[in-house]
UniProtKB/Swiss-Prot annotation:
This is Uncharacterized RNA methyltransferase BCE_0363. Its EC number is 2.1.1.-. It is an enzyme of class 2 (transferase). S-adenosyl-L-methionine binds at Q290, Y319, E340, D388. [4Fe-4S] cluster binds at C79, C85, C88, C166. Keywords: 4Fe-4S, Iron, Iron-sulfur, Metal-binding, Methyltransferase, S-adenosyl-L-methionine, Transferase.
Length: 460
């Protein structure tokens, strides 16, 4: 008969612990008799007094009360609202410490999930200046004391904290959004109230082209009616000549989803333009576009290096999105085929190929695991397969398709080390060897880490 394990700690108990590790969301991990306790702001190696605030069967949560010893990597967060906002998780850790923690995270999952203990994991490629890197700001609008507030939701709530600037956001976007808030307030625009489903302005979004300097402004409203629209647009366009596009998106639904279905251009163009390396991209209000183009170039350069192209290869890019990796590869490949399930993304991909006069990139809509076997039957043989899946990783059917097609190389671009390690294990069992793993820091001060991996087919 099994005996039920009783947790070794109780709620409201004060205990001394040593933090051993960080979780994937940046909390410190301490253990009591092997039982894990997660504590926000704890860092590995630190000795601390904590208070137990929630006890579950297999783990508990604690609050950091007092540090007995401090990590040499601990620092004061530079953002005044760091502890209220959920946007960053690692500002209390030096940037060097962040990069080391991310490298360890990748190594750990390679061993624990992938069983790949001997694979070279390189040091994380970080940023020279890990601030003001985000090119897209999406802020909720609210009302307080008769005025508009714009900022972010307090962690775990829908309470908007007013914020003049964000340290990881492009300053151009911050400046624009604060001025737009003042202009809208002056012209009597009401904020959306989600409890009453009243009011006009739900969110404001700004997109900034880091290379071109062009900005797009998006008003997301509950109703198609935007009072004093003409005067608002004139004032914004006069004050901000770099704003090349002002767009309205209407979302009448009671939902947490930000965008509605209807988008209208109010001023200028439907697109702004930006470059990653030598490739030019047209970016619409709804386009997926990497939020840190500087590090995206680092990631794509490494992808291109791993693909080892000399101009004679056929490459398939699964989960190709707006064609950003496909077009990078098309600079060196004979032919690139990109596949993506979102039709609008494929329209963007075709537009971007035309924009760059690239005739050797072809795009198809559908599930990669359906479209790629169809191409295979039509005689498309990939020398190199590139995959860049969402966080859930590759569909099992796609992994089986890769194993059946036997491309010489697989380059796997990942935003989730855990699903990456799981998928590498499947490909290893199917005849591939993982040669090297290169983590890239796309989102400094957060726990996210991207990786690009080179796999080669082992001929038996």
């Amino acid at each position: 008969m099994s005996t039920k394990m009783t947790p070794p700690v109780e709620k409201n108990e004060f205990i001394d612990v040593v933090f051993e590790d960080l979780t994937h969301d940046g909390a410190g991990v301490a253990k009591v008799k092997g039982y894990p306790i997660f504590v926000k702001n704890g860092l590995p190696g630190e000795e601390a007094q904590i208070k137990i605030i929630k006890v579950k069967k297999n783990f508990a949560f604690g609050r950091l009360m007092k540090l007995h010893t401090e990590s040499p990597y601990r620092k004061d967060a530079e953002c005044p609202v760091y502890n209220q906002c959920g946007g960053c998780q690692l500002q209390h850790l030096t940037y060097e410490g962040q990069l080391q923690a991310k490298e360890k995270q990748v190594r750990d999952v390679m061993q624990r999930i992938g069983g790949l203990s001997d694979v070279p994991v390189h040091p994380v490629l970080g940023m020279k200046n890990p601030w003001v890197y985000r090119n897209k700001a999406q802020v909720p609008i609210g009302e307080r004391e008769g005025g508009l507030v714009a900022g972010f939701y307090r962690q775990g709530t829908h309470d908007i904290i007013n914020m003049e600037s964000c340290l990881i956001q492009a300053e151009e976007n911050d400046t624009l959004i604060q001025e737009v808030k003042r202009i809208c307030e002056k012209h009597g625009i009401s904020a959306y109230n989600e409890e009453r489903n009243k009011g006009t302005l739900r969110h404001v979004m700004a997109r900034y082209g880091q290379v071109t300097g062009e900005i797009m402004l998006v008003f997301i409203t509950r109703t198609a009616e935007l009072p004093n629209k003409k005067a608002i647009i004139e004032e914004i366009a006069t004050k901000f000549p770099e704003v090349k596009s002002i767009v309205q998106n209407v979302n009448p639904k009671r939902t947490n989803v930000i965008f509605g279905d209807k988008t209208t251009v109010l001023y200028g163009s439907e697109y702004i333009y930006d470059f990653i390396g030598d490739i030019k991209f047209a970016i619409s209000a709804r386009s997926f576009y990497q939020v840190n183009p500087e590090q995206t170039k680092v990631l794509y350069d490494k992808t291109l290096e791993y693909a080892k192209l000399d101009g004679n290869e056929t490459v398939i890019d699964a989960y190709c999105g707006i064609g950003s990796i496909s077009l990078f590869l098309a600079q060196k490949a004979k032919k690139v085929y990109g596949v993506e399930i979102v039709p609008e993304a494929i329209e963007d991909a075709k537009r971007n190929a035309a924009l760059n006069n690239m005739t050797n990139a072809e795009f198809g809509v559908g599930e990669a695991e359906v479209v790629i076997p169809k191409w295979y039957k039509e005689g498309v043989i990939a020398d190199t397969m590139v995959v860049d899946p969402p966080r859930k990783g590759c569909d099992e059917a796609l992994l089986n398709t890769i194993i059946d097609m036997k491309p010489k190389r697989v380059v796997y671009v990942s935003c989730n080390p855990a699903t990456l390690a799981r998928d590498l294990k499947v490909l290893e069992e199917g005849g591939y060897k993982t040669q090297e793993v290169q983590p890239v820091d796309m989102f400094p001060h957060t726990t996210h880490v991207e990786c690009v991996v080179l796999m080669s087919r082992v001929e038996k």
